[in-house]
Amino acid sequence: MIAIQLPDGSRREFDGPVTVAEVAASIGAGLAKAALAGRIGTGDAARLVDTSHRIEADEALSIITAKDAAGLDVIRHSTAHLLAYAVKELFPDAQVTIGPTIENGFFYDFSYKRPFTPDDLAAIEKKMGDLAAKDEPVVRSVMPRDEAVSYFKSIGEAYKAEIIESIPADQAVSLYAEGKFTDLCRGPHVPSTGKLKFFKLMKVAGAYWRGDHRNEMLQRIYGTAWATKDDLQKYLVMLEEAEKRDHRKLGRELDLFHIDEHAPGVVFWHPKGWTVWQQVEQYMRRVYRDNGYQEVKGPQILDKGLWEKTGHWDKYRDNMFTTESEKRDYALKPMNCPGHILIFKQGIKSYRDLPLRYGEFGQCHRNEPSGGLHGIMRVRGFTQDDGHIFCTEDQILPECDAFTTLLQKVYADFGFTEILYKVATRPEKRIGSDELWDKAEAALIASLRNSGCEFEISPGEGAFYGPKVEYTLKDALGRHWQCGTIQVDFSLPERLDAEYVAESGERLHPVMLHRAILGSLERFIGILIEEHAGALPFWLAPTQVSVLNITDGQADYARDVARSLQKQGLRVALDLRNEKITYKIREHSLQKVPYLIVVGDKERASGAVAVRARGNQDLGVMALEAFSQKLAAELAT
């Protein structure tokens, strides 16, 4: 007898070995039809298997359907294979390489003699639909490694053969076949192609084989797949909205910034964009000042010797911009922490000085691959609201407490109220005692509980030198942006000989808390632009008020109105052009200015202004003083 333990605690017994599909069928016809895979085992030992997997001994089993996150991943992985199947049917000379799942979808890389066209993409998607409609079984088999290499070479799949050759010779490999197509894969996969109904191919892009620019450029076809037609449609609508909000598009239309071929991955800020930058920076500077941070500034270029001590020279050198001068090697800093330790080390520090909080708008450079650059969201030169707290072990909890509370307020001020929290705990390879890790992890978890946060724990995902909390924003489109972090570091102060004098007179290494709220200011501003679709909150808008005259007869009055508002500290544009007022209103509305003031003869005669708010709201005519008070009140909230 074989006993199967189900998630609801019930047990089912079978006379002998049984497949996942057979267990599902024993529960009900509906579950048998919906089953996509199974999860056997519990805890860290649990693993996903095909519905054809035979269970030979007592086991815990969960049936995976499209309602489960794991089920959606199985659908997407299987759809990637369906894509490769369709490509091979239409373009037999194409070679398949790899096809993993990614967020919201999948991709597959192909080697082919010419670029795939939009018409090709449409034909491939249609072929995928035809193959899915045939509802062909997806069959798993196992083959010795060398035999698998020979098989793929025999059918002209050199890339697959190369992948398999990198697997140890004594390991067997699993293959999945659907119709005439066979692919290498760990699995699991859906039981038949008929389970794959709701998908769409999105685009074609270039990708180097194995991510190495010295290798052949392949063609990467991206797609998305979902459990239901409604889910697919919602996702496609979200993508349409995201395209309208694309910060690169809005950056051009609103004249905020540009990226130039002469400096790939570095931002050229235009006057309006730099105004937004300054508002963000000045806000964060007040945050530093009001929360006990001392602002510092370190050099951008530092000697190689420092990076050797920190370990970056060995592990991160390929991502650093380096130079040489007078037979000394230097690097542009990719991060600010070593510089802050050098500042901490100047002069003797006592336990009475701790916690010591440094903050910097630190400009960093990282040599990101050109293919990964994306507007101002993924750049090579960026500025961080980077802070480091030097403290004792007992101060970790109160500092983490204060930081989480502060971060929540900052995000709310920028319009973000949905935050996801994740605690990354100790990895297997780490430094520091278990007692110290216990204290640090407990402090991070307690700080989130004290703030009333729901959070998830990611076991083993902390750095070797300490655990961390990641703070992720959820935007108006439901997308996630990981921005903030607080990272406990037991290592770097010791590596760079940072010490303080304890109450006992003993010299100790401080604990270092790396913390950022916005992360990269460039990226955060990109997120803000997309979150607000370019219509930034009044306090952030590069132009807050535009003053428009109807005819030349009101030009002097319009100047007086603009001057009065500017004296109030507002950012005002004055448009005295000899154009129709409807044209001027439309042009400034497209620039997403929060308030437009129109002045004609009536307004001039009464000392009033006609006010239009963003979104085509007519607020009517009001006294200039009343309008000024309204804006002052809005800024005060």
Swiss-Prot record:
It is found in: Cytoplasm. The keyword Lipid metabolism does not apply. Belongs to the class-II aminoacyl-tRNA synthetase family. It comes from the Bacteria. Residues 1-65 form the TGS domain. Keywords: Aminoacyl-tRNA synthetase, ATP-binding, Cytoplasm, Ligase, Metal-binding, Nucleotide-binding, Protein biosynthesis, RNA-binding, tRNA-binding, Zinc. Its cofactor is Zn(2+). It catalyses: tRNA(Thr) + L-threonine + ATP = L-threonyl-tRNA(Thr) + AMP + diphosphate + H(+). SMART domains: tRNA_SAD. Signal peptide: none annotated. It comes from Leptothrix cholodnii (strain ATCC 51168 / LMG 8142 / SP-6) (Leptothrix discophora (strain SP-6)). Its EC number is 6.1.1.3. Binds 1 zinc ion per subunit. The keyword Zinc applies. Homodimer. This is Threonine--tRNA ligase. One of its GO terms (cellular component) is cytosol. Catalyzes the attachment of threonine to tRNA(Thr) in a two-step reaction: L-threonine is first activated by ATP to form Thr-AMP and then transferred to the acceptor end of tRNA(Thr). Also edits incorrectly charged L-seryl-tRNA(Thr). Residues 246-537 are annotated as: Catalytic. The gene is thrS. PROSITE patterns: AA_TRNA_LIGASE_II, TGS. HAMAP family: Thr_tRNA_synth. InterPro entries: aa-tRNA-synt_IIb, aa-tRNA-synth_II, aa-tRNA-synth_II/BPL/LPL, Anticodon-bd, Anticodon-bd_dom_sf, Beta-grasp_dom_sf, TGS, TGS-like. Zn(2+) binds at C337, H388, H514. Gene3D superfamilies: 3.10.20.30, 3.30.54.20, Anticodon-binding domain, Bira Bifunctional Protein, Domain 2, Threonyl-trna Synthetase, Chain A, domain 2. GO terms for biological process: threonyl-tRNA aminoacylation. GO terms for molecular function: ATP binding; metal ion binding; threonine-tRNA ligase activity; tRNA binding. It holds the Pfam family TGS.
